[in-house]
Curated annotation (Swiss-Prot):
ATP binds at residues 205-208. The gene is hldE. It catalyses: D-glycero-beta-D-manno-heptose 7-phosphate + ATP = D-glycero-beta-D-manno-heptose 1,7-bisphosphate + ADP + H(+); D-glycero-beta-D-manno-heptose 1-phosphate + ATP + H(+) = ADP-D-glycero-beta-D-manno-heptose + diphosphate. Its EC number is 2.7.1.167, 2.7.7.70. This is Bifunctional protein HldE. It comes from Syntrophotalea carbinolica (strain DSM 2380 / NBRC 103641 / GraBd1). In the N-terminal section; belongs to the carbohydrate kinase PfkB family. In the C-terminal section; belongs to the cytidylyltransferase family. Pathway: Nucleotide-sugar biosynthesis; ADP-L-glycero-beta-D-manno-heptose biosynthesis; ADP-L-glycero-beta-D-manno-heptose from D-glycero-beta-D-manno-heptose 7-phosphate: step 1/4; Nucleotide-sugar biosynthesis; ADP-L-glycero-beta-D-manno-heptose biosynthesis; ADP-L-glycero-beta-D-manno-heptose from D-glycero-beta-D-manno-heptose 7-phosphate: step 3/4. One of its GO terms (biological process) is ADP-L-glycero-beta-D-manno-heptose biosynthetic process. The keyword Nucleotide-binding applies. Residues 1-330 are annotated as: Ribokinase.
């Protein structure tokens, strides 16, 4: 993550304009104490001491956007009863544009009532409609989006399967976004993702990705297969899978991907975390951030929100504070090859010498560290090309790697001698070397110059190859064998 770029983006939030389309709800919280059992039945009695009523569903996306200071408009259908009018009033109080709202006498505005005691949610009651909106309401919403799209920098779609987001409406919204060059970012729901076909970006969680793709996710490889299958099936530019304690994984149409570790320190309530992710990713794209940086910021925001109880939001000050306290320099070192190519071109123009090496680095040991330190001393910047999990399996067999590519990348990025880490999926780093064009290509002393992949390419544009002696007796294979021997000995 480029921290300066993010800071500049946060300073411009007030100028961004977002349209939120989706299922609006009221989130009601009843806070109390449980100190006795009911005489009527063997159940706890909750003595309510505090009540809270908030915008929920797509309304929590609005909460996030308003808290962040940007300009917000909404398009949806509500019931005409008390809750619908109350929700409208809450939107007006937040200065949200409501010209896209419709009201239906036959519809029940969604209200979710949660009972909390001793810091835990005990029960939830739902009152809502789930039937699709009618054709007239659908046409009115589509016309509103089409006529007003030029006023917005991003369209955020929050689907809770309550009937507002029909397939025809979604396809109309996505088509308008493409025509106008406006990103359409969707937080999806359900198992039929055909209605999201052609969207700019989807933000399903891990379970939703499993259901939509039909592929059980048990490791990084199955996650990749599920993501790629889903993207191809519904013609997606980008898929961003939120993975709770495992962070966020982003998959791009060009085959590249990036993985971000979780930023949560303590988790009290995951309610609304997906809304925070949708809000920050959407605003990031609207503000010109690369997807990976928008996702990294959203990851930080979600980490803040899950540390709060109830449907919560994050503000700019909290984001600044989190960026100051988290070790974001590690994340900023892990790059996609195309973005890293651009960075290295700038550094070379500044007179910097780029050193490149590559490997699996499964079970990092002292031999690795000394090798990397020596490589770094050969130039100004050390770039490490890291074999992906799939690449290692092809090279070393199905039992490897022991450490996932995401974890290996972050361990290596924590080393001060490494400036950038880039994961590659090919069997050799030749294509990556051709993209990055390093000045110095480094391999271990167990190679000869003639056996180094990329030697001819690097020398063809004036670069050179360097071989570094390895530490005797230090290898991942030796460590594994030693562990197994000692385990067998008891």
């Amino acid at each position: 993550m480029d921290r300066t770029n993010i800071e500049n983006f946060l300073s411009r939030l007030k100028d961004l304009r977002a349209l939120v389309i989706g299922d609006l709800m009221l989130d009601e919280y009843l806070w109390g104490r449980t100190e006795r059992i009911s005489p009527e039945a063997p159940v706890q009695v909750v003595d309510v001491v505090r009540e809270d009523l908030r915008l929920g569903g797509a309304g929590n996306v609005i909460n996030n956007l308003v808290t962040l200071g940007c300009q917000v408009h909404v398009a949806s259908v509500l019931g005409e009863g008390h809750d619908g009018l109350l929700l409208r009033r809450r939107l007006e109080e937040k200065q949200v544009g409501i010209e896209g709202l419709q009201f239906d006498a036959k519809r029940t505005t969604s209200r979710k009532t949660r009972i909390l005691a001793s810091g835990q949610q005990m029960m939830r009651f739902d009152r809502e409609s789930r039937c699709p909106i009618d054709a007239t309401q659908e046409a009115v919403l589509a016309e509103f989006v089409s006529n007003s799209a030029d006023r917005f920098d991003v369209i955020l779609v929050s689907d809770y399967l309550k009937g507002v987001l029909t397939e025809d409406l979604l396809q109309s919204v996505i088509a308008v976004g493409k025509q106008k060059g406006i990103p359409v970012v969707i937080d999806p729901k359900g198992n039929d993702y055909a209605k999201y076909r052609g969207a700019t970006l989807l933000t399903p969680n891990r379970k939703e990705t499993e259901v939509a793709s039909g592929i059980s996710i048990v490791d990084e490889e199955s996650l990749r297969l599920a993501a790629r299958t889903l993207m191809q099936r519904i013609d997606l530019e980008t898929l961003m899978v939120t993975r709770s304690e495992e962070g966020i994984s982003i998959f791009f149409r060009n085959g590249e991907e990036v993985h971000l570790p979780t930023q949560a320190r303590e988790v009290y309530d995951v309610t609304g975390a997906g809304d925070t992710v949708l809000s920050l990713v959407g605003l990031g794209l609207a503000g010109g951030l690369p997807v990976s940086e928008a996702a990294a910021l959203a990851n930080i925001g979600a980490g803040i929100v899950v540390g709060k109880v109830g449907t919560s939001t994050v503000n700019v000050e909290e984001l600044h504070e989190a960026m100051a306290h988290h070790a974001l320099e590690y994340d900023s070192k892990i790059r996609l090859r195309e973005s890293l190519r651009d960075v290295l071109e700038v550094e070379r123009r500044r007179g910097k010498t780029v050193v490149f090496t590559n490997g699996c680095f499964d079970l990092l040991h002292v031999g690795h560290v000394k090798y990397l330190q020596k490589a770094r001393r050969l130039g100004d910047l050390l770039v490490l090309g890291l074999n992906s999990d799939a690449s290692i399996r092809r090279l070393k067999g199905p039992s490897r790697p022991l450490i996932s590519e995401q974890e290996r990348a972050h361990i290596l990025a924590a080393l001060s001698c490494i400036d950038y880490v880039v994961v590659f999926d090919e069997d050799t780093p030749l294509e990556l070397i051709d993209t990055l064009r390093p000045d110095i290509l480094v391999k271990g002393g167990d190679y000869t110059p003639e056996t180094v992949v990329g030697k001819d390419l690097v020398e063809s544009y004036g670069g050179r190859v360097e071989l570094i002696d390895l530490v005797d007796g230090r290898s991942t294979t030796n460590i594994i064998e030693r562990i197994l021997d000692r385990y067998e000995q008891g």
